[in-house]
Amino acid sequence: MLDTSIQELIDKWQKYLDLQRNYSNHTVISYNNDLKHFLEFMNYYNSELVTINHIKTADIRLIRSWLAKRNCDNFTTSSISRGLSAVKNFYRFLEKTTQLNSHIIFSIKSPKKTKLLPKALSEDDVVISLEHIEEYGNVKWVELRNKALLVLIYASGLRISEALSITKLHLQNLEFIRIIGKGSKERIIPWLPIAKNLITQYLEILPYKLGDNEPIFRGKQGKKLQPPVFNRELIKLKHFYGLPQHLTAHSFRHSFASHLLEHGADLRSIQELLGHKSLSTTQNYTKTSIKHLEAVYTTAYPIKK
């Protein structure tokens, strides 16, 4: 429960993030959830309905208590950092639009993130997944949708959000897909015939009519398919076939990059295909590839036995 004036500020802030800062819909939603979590904690902390004055006078002890609460609630370091960034962003917005100046929150540093290397699947696990994902749909068009989507992600290295944004217009180019990724950065990815053919087969039996600009991957009720729904299909697959715990839609993007690297692709090309802003992000895949080689060496090299 929020004070009306605060809710109005939040609504204006969300429009600012969307229209002026060009944040993705996913980021706006995440930031909004983080801010509401902060305000709910402030409600509890002050034992009364939060007002704009509470927000302006929030002290460092309250903010640190909120961060500690998120840590106790098993939020990841990344989620805690994002939450603090969201609240700082809101306070910056208040500086622009109200009389708030130099709030103490800007002196608080985000917790250091643990750098996790991307986890790829083995090529065998990818093959098993692609061969059997059709078994989890109960309806023919859903089964074909699942396979087309998974093949597209692995064949093109797309993020799940990017894959779910594919429209009929993307299919009109016979050679390339134009993708708008993070930060509204455009990249061009070659169409693999197997992915395009599966999508075409899926669209032929899809029971819903779509306009050229509508996302082609649909849920059972005809609405745009959401990432959690597809990941639930992958959970069923993972459990039945005893596949790795880290198998998610995103792990197929990691696998795309790792397998290209293992088969001789250069880092710059992989960077372009993934849409990474920095080469250092792509270089993480060299570390996972080295770990893969070490594992092979340890288990298979004759002199070690």
Swiss-Prot record:
SUPFAM superfamilies: DNA breaking-rejoining enzymes (SSF56349). The active site is at R159, K182, H250, R253, H276, Y285 (o-(3'-phospho-dna)-tyrosine intermediate). Residues 116-298 form the Tyr recombinase domain. InterPro entries: CB, DNA_brk_join_enz, Integrase-like_cat_sf, Integrase_catalytic, Integrase_recombinase_N, Integrase_SAM-like_N, Tyrosine_recombinase_XerC/XerD, Tyrosine_recombinase_XerCD. It comes from the Bacteria. Signal peptide: none annotated. It is found in: Cytoplasm. Transmembrane segments: none annotated. Residues 4-95 form the Core-binding (CB) domain. GO terms for cellular component: cytoplasm. Keywords: Cell cycle, Cell division, Chromosome partition, Cytoplasm, DNA integration, DNA recombination, DNA-binding. GO terms for molecular function: DNA binding; tyrosine-based site-specific recombinase activity. Belongs to the 'phage' integrase family. XerC subfamily. This is Tyrosine recombinase XerC. The gene is xerC.
